[in-house]
């Protein structure tokens, strides 16, 4: 059960609340760097998320001091505007200004009504309302309903990415994330790309076919190998794909693809497409062509 879905009766009403978060302003961003970040555990003890987030934060969270807390403790602390919080939630897309909507807005394809599993980085707020909490660069992990095996291995890389985002916010409260990705794009040709074969469209699922479109260094790997590369801060890049996975494909489903650096979480490339029979939930041939323009 996600952090704000405490009572079943409120699930429908609260499902989209975090999608309405707004970006932190300059003062709130500055306060973040003075804050302690509270890592909020999930109430569901059967999820592997809790041991994973504790392990990965311990390895990769460098930007602020942190403390792991329960949801009960979060309810007490969330009204403190001097504290920051990292927690899991579900959220629908909205027209409000937050980091994911900024990225999604670069691409056409219609309105996205899907719900996403989000790793939130926010400041506390006196009202205690989650949709009032200033967003510091929350990042989607997966579409809601995706099994943990589709996102837990990427949490370390996403934590690194979040820290890169908030450092950019410190320089400029309204950074041009697309420009940042484009500036980093040239690094793709100098770093080995690691991809999981099943996350590629069927026509790319052989090394021969992939190499025809991608002449640079690459490797087909497992989820465990990507997690280990992030833990070791290896000089490779990897695909962070967000899509329906094994869920039933709807007309509104989108596939979002990030290329991230395992070493430091830098965003090197991002693309998004509406899922269809011709464009499956996977990295496409056209994605490789676009990356290498």
Predicted regions and their residues:
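Flexible, glycine-rich surface segments
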Residues: 167-254
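Hydrophobic beta-strand residues in large extracellular and virion-surface proteins
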Residues: 86, 119-121, 193
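A general structural signal for short secondary-structure junctions and capping/turn motifs
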Residues: 2, 75-78, 228-229
């Amino acid at each position: 059960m996600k952090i704000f879905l405490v009572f079943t009766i409120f699930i429908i009403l609260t499902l989209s609340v975090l999608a309405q978060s707004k970006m932190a302003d300059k003062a709130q961003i500055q306060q973040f760097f003075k804050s302690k970040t509270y890592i909020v555990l999930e109430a569901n003890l059967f999820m592997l998320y809790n041991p994973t987030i504790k392990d990965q934060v311990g390895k990769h969270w460098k930007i602020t001091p942190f403390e792991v807390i329960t949801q009960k403790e979060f309810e007490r602390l969330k009204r403190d505007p001097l504290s920051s919080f990292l927690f899991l939630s579900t959220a629908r897309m909205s027209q409000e200004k937050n980091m994911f909507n900024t990225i999604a807005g670069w691409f056409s394809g219609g309105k996205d009504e899907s719900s996403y599993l989000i790793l939130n980085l926010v400041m506390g707020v006196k009202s205690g309302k989650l949709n009032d909490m200033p967003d510091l660069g929350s990042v989607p992990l997966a579409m809601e309903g995706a099994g943990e095996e589709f996102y837990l291995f990427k949490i370390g890389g996403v934590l690194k990415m979040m820290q890169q985002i908030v450092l950019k916010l410190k320089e400029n409260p309204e950074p041009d994330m697309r420009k940042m990705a484009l500036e980093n794009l040239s690094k793709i040709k100098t770093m080995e790309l690691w991809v999981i074969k099943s996350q590629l469209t069927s026509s790319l699922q052989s090394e021969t076919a992939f190499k025809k479109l991608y002449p640079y260094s690459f490797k087909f790997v497992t989820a465990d190998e990507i997690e280990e590369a992030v833990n070791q801060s290896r000089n490779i890049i990897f695909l962070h794909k967000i899509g329906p996975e094994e869920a039933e494909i709807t007309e509104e489903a989108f596939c979002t693809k990030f290329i991230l650096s395992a070493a430091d979480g830098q965003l090197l490339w991002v693309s998004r497409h509406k899922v269809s029979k011709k464009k499956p939930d996977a990295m496409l041939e056209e994605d490789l062509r676009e990356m290498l323009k």
